[in-house]
């Protein structure tokens, strides 16, 4: 997807969310990104609007890069939804469960393939995911 977001835009968003958390404006877990801004922007150059994105509880960057408006994302995070951000209209879904999004992404990919769709399915996970049986069953 073509984005006008810069690494600094992503960093600033996470810093703002961290500040809200430190000021007790968020009464739920948050998981912030740091250090991979250029890489994820590069990856999202290949993500199309019709593509699906699945990720874990650390999904703020993916949501922003998939087109979720900054203010809407911040509002949902402030409401305590940081680890379960789902925006079907933007085709982005996250799960608070390690490996929780992997089988769902796998099923979505199979459905898109069977429909003959041009949509791709992208699944972002952390390193602990590779230690779970569900990951290996789905990959």
Regions from the PLM with identified roles:
Residues 1-29:
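Cofactor-/ligand-binding subdomain signature composed of acidic, glycine-rich
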Residues 18, 24-139:
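Cofactor-binding active-site loop characterized by glycine-rich and histidine/acidic residues
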């Amino acid at each position: 997807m073509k984005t006008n977001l810069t690494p600094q835009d992503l960093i600033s968003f996470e810093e703002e969310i961290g500040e809200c958390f430190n000021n007790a404006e968020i009464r739920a877990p948050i998981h912030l990104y740091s250090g991979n801004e250029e890489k994820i922007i590069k990856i999202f150059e290949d993500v199309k609007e019709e593509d699906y994105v699945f990720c874990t509880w650390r999904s703020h960057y993916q949501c922003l890069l998939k087109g979720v408006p900054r203010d809407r994302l911040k509002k949902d995070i402030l409401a305590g939804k940081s680890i379960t951000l789902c925006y079907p209209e933007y085709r982005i879904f996250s799960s608070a469960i390690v490996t929780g999004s992997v089988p769902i992404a796998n099923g979505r990919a199979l459905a898109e393939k069977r429909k003959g769709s041009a949509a791709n399915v992208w699944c972002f996970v952390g390193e602990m995911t590779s230690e779970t049986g569900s990951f290996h069953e789905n990959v």
